[in-house]
Design a protein with these regions (language model features):
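Active-site C-terminal subdomain of aminotransferase-like
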Residues: 95-200, 206-210
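Residue-identity detector for threonine
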Residues: 2, 28, 69, 139-142, ...
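Conserved C-terminal alpha-helix-loop-beta "cap" of PLP-dependent enzymes
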Residues: 177-271
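Electropositive phosphate-/nucleotide-binding environments in soluble metabolic enzymes
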Residues: 15, 19, 23, 44-47, ...
Length: 278
């Protein structure tokens, strides 16, 4: 998308703790960048220091953009809107949409009010109907959406509309407390597995033990992540994703994910297989 538009993408390297360094952002972005995009939790599952990164982006005159690839984290972690980010966008498949061979997906996009009229698409807002009851309507929609459709900034297909409805129903059923409980469950199970790995003194260790994580963490050790996956598979454990082949400045290791779908028996099986290989 960016290459055809003549937009240059510069990648800032993470620090020794697996997080983006604000100074690296300043050096990479300089005063030429239009925006600084930050994923949190990042590829390694590490939660970024959002306030410092937003400040670093704004110092050079760039917009600060947070990308959330695991929306379940928002039940526990404050989003970029709480830390002076201009745009927050991401993937909301976790909100009640079952994965099927990778899809379907549901993207979300939010921004500061000062950028509202530059947003693509239409905004649905809350209002009241003629009886005074709660209702929803299109509160902002560019005329091109309805008149000059060839010049519209976006169009939504039926499938995406269905995904939005499904996620809305799921969130309404879960409620704020339910979403927080789910997020906390993911966090606590991940922390339990990390603690158990450190307790057994395995040669496979947590890559960044001091950095906060959500859902995922990186295991590094005497061999490659690909080798560890194969060895654990021989013990009937589907362990995770090797970082090799994904590009980026990541150590060669195994990315392990823990969610509310992983039972205590699943964690026990993982630990038993890892201890056997150690």
């Amino acid at each position: 998308y960016t290459e055809a538009a003549g937009i240059e993408v510069a990648v800032a390297a993470p620090g020794a703790d697996g997080r983006l360094d604000p100074e690296a952002i300043r050096e990479t972005a300089g005063d030429r960048a239009c925006c600084v995009a930050v994923q949190s939790p990042n590829f390694l599952g590490i939660v970024e220091d959002l306030p410092r990164l937003a400040a670093a982006a704004h110092e050079g005159g760039a917009l600060a953009v947070e990308v959330v690839t695991e929306a379940a984290s928002l039940g526990l972690l404050a989003g970029g809107g709480s830390f002076d980010f201009d745009v927050v966008c991401g993937e909301a498949q976790s909100f009640g949409i079952a994965p099927g061979f990778g899809g379907p997906h549901l993207g979300f996009f939010a921004c500061d009010s000062k950028h509202l009229r530059q947003m693509p698409g239409r905004l649905a807002g809350e209002s009241v109907d003629e009886n005074g009851d709660r209702a929803f309507c299109l509160t902002l929609s560019t005329r091109e959406q309805h008149i000059r459709r060839a010049k519209a900034t976006s169009n939504i297909c039926t499938n995406q509309g269905l995904m939005a409805v499904a996620a809305t129903v799921w969130l309404e059923a879960m409620g704020g407390s339910g979403l927080r409980e789910l997020s906390l469950s993911c966090f606590m199970r991940t922390e339990e597995l990390k603690r158990r790995i450190m307790d057994i003194g395995s040669p496979w260790r947590i890559a960044h033990p001091e950095s906060p994580t959500f859902n995922e963490f990186l295991l590094i050790g005497p061999g490659s992540g690909t080798e560890l996956v194969k060895r654990l598979a021989s013990e009937s454990v589907l362990a995770g994703v090797p970082t090799t082949g994904w590009g980026g400045p990541w150590p060669d290791g195994l990315l392990v994910a823990v969610t509310e779908c992983n039972s205590a028996a699943d964690l026990d099986a993982f630990m038993a297989a890892l201890e056997k290989l150690s």
